[in-house]
Amino acid sequence: MFPKYLILIFIYFIIIYCGEIKNLKDFLTDVIIDTHGDFKYILMEMVNKTNMNDYKYLIRGSNEFDYHKRLYFNFMQNSVYKFPDVYKNFNFKVLGGGRIAFKGKDIIVYGESGVYGKANHKLTCNLLKKQFPSFNVKDL
């Protein structure tokens, strides 16, 4: 998994050398989470403003944040607000939250957000299985 700052540098590089990006969802990482411990996460939907059938689900989670809302604000500040020309064709909506726990080779998805409600844990598990194929991912 790449450090967050490398992802931002990559996006900046794309902006400078490629101009406006029409299909951002193809290279925006589905899952950016810590890979240890027990932490809060949010499930978001990224939708193209001109084509509602063009969408992607994103998971963001970290030990750094005590509140689901701060995860969302961090994502917006470090991505959308930092590069408004790149993200101007997309809307981002939080679909819910919960917790992710790494326990050995198991990833456990559970809980809910007080602000955003419970995320679709089955969808979250499917995205995590793609990102971590050697782990046993389960929903409680």
Residue ranges and their predicted role:
Residues 1-8:
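Classical eukaryotic N-terminal signal peptides for Sec-dependent ER targeting/secretion
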Residues 5, 15-140:
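Intrinsic low-complexity, intrinsically disordered or marginally ordered coil/linker segments
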